[in-house]
Amino acid sequence: MAGAKEIRSKIASVQNTQKITKAMEMVAASKMRKSQDRMAASRPYAETMRKVIGHLAHGNLEYKHLYLEDRDVKRVGYLVVSTDRGLCGGLNINLFKKLLAEMKTWTDKGVQCDLAMIGSKGVSFFNSVGGNVVAQVTGMGDNPSLSELIGPVKVMLQAYDEGRLDKLYIVSNKFINTMSQVPTISQLLPLPASDDDDLKHKSWDYLYEPDPKALLDTLLRRYVESQVYQGVVENLASEQAARMVAMKAATDNGGSLIKELQLVYNKARQASITQELTEIVSGAAAV
């Protein structure tokens, strides 16, 4: 059995670690609330854009935009949103596992996959497994702006415009609540039609002013940007929630470990006292 001094040292070490994890839990909780506010502010815009585009996909358009036309699929692209920091439980790895399964489905059909990464964890993971990373951005902090993440978006849109990609997806964690974050893969291009049953059996004619091509070019690119930005802020809120939960679990586990070590310490101390008493009694008997 370890000595009492060694056990006391272990208890002090766990207590120090517990203070760190408790502080990280509180910081994550504060950041999560701010991230939720940003997410709530941007979500209505992103959802409205999705509805408008879904409505548009059912319309009889006088100008058929490139982003509305289905193609034979030979290569697909993924915009992958991950975190820059760790200590957030299985948030990243669950997302990566889902994406790897999706990519395997395509590669089994002979379709190649390109990856544009947002977040350093995704970059390091997919570089290690041999993924074809064609663009990346990292270190965006806790309050990312669209201008910071537009680089990978432009790379993938250019590839789609030039016919080097036939489908484009965004991969991110959707924030449900503090205890639940769901890895999602959503199609960006070609634009998916709305799944609203009321729209499936209707069609519309649109009038554009001043020019349908210029209007649709701007609108559809803005749609893609809005969905990517929403994916980033949702993933950020998911990250802070997952980190808060992970740090709380670490703090609680530290408390349990301290109790176990305290019990071991008490037993060691009791054994030491018993041994000392035995030695005293033996010495007295010898005299």
From Swiss-Prot:
UniProt keyword annotation of Cell membrane present: yes
Primary residence: membrane
GO BP, one annotated term: proton motive force-driven plasma membrane ATP synthesis
Single annotated GO MF: proton-transporting ATP synthase activity, rotational mechanism
UniProt superkingdom: Bacteria
Function: Produces ATP from ADP in the presence of a proton gradient across the membrane. The gamma chain is believed to be important in regulating ATPase activity and the flow of protons through the CF(0) complex.
Oligomer and partners: F-type ATPases have 2 components, CF(1) - the catalytic core - and CF(0) - the membrane proton channel. CF(1) has five subunits: alpha(3), beta(3), gamma(1), delta(1), epsilon(1). CF(0) has three main subunits: a, b and c.
Protein name per the record: ATP synthase gamma chain
Lineage, top ranks: Bacteria, Pseudomonadati, Pseudomonadota, Gammaproteobacteria, Enterobacterales
